[in-house]
């Protein structure tokens, strides 16, 4: 089973690959995705879609608006992986 730390690292990799402008920016679990980073709503949609593909999970669209921090995103992925 994948650990939370592994989910976090893979999530960061996907974000850095999806948003090259974030190169050199430290992403922590408390990083607010839409305000602390250069990710706009379209970029956020791209990141979530790529994360769903990377982890082979589906995060319902209605839950996306509740994903504020990197930790929230990791929580959502972790929850889906343990189902």
What are these regions (language model features)?
Residues 71-80:
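C-terminal structural segments of small proteins and small subunits
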Residues 43:
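Two-component histidine kinase catalytic core, primarily the HATPase_c
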Residues 10, 69-72:
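Charged catalytic carboxylate motif
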Residues 18-38, 54-66:
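Phosphopantetheine carrier-protein modules
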């Amino acid at each position: 089973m994948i650990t939370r730390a592994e989910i976090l690292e893979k999530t960061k990799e996907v974000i850095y690959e999806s948003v090259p402008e974030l190169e050199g920016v430290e992403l922590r679990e408390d990083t607010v995705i839409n305000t602390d980073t250069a990710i706009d709503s379209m970029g956020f949609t791209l990141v979530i879609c790529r994360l769903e593909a990377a982890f082979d999970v589906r995060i319902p669209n209605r839950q996306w608006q509740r994903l504020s921090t990197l930790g929230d995103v990791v929580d959502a992925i972790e929850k889906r992986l343990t189902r």
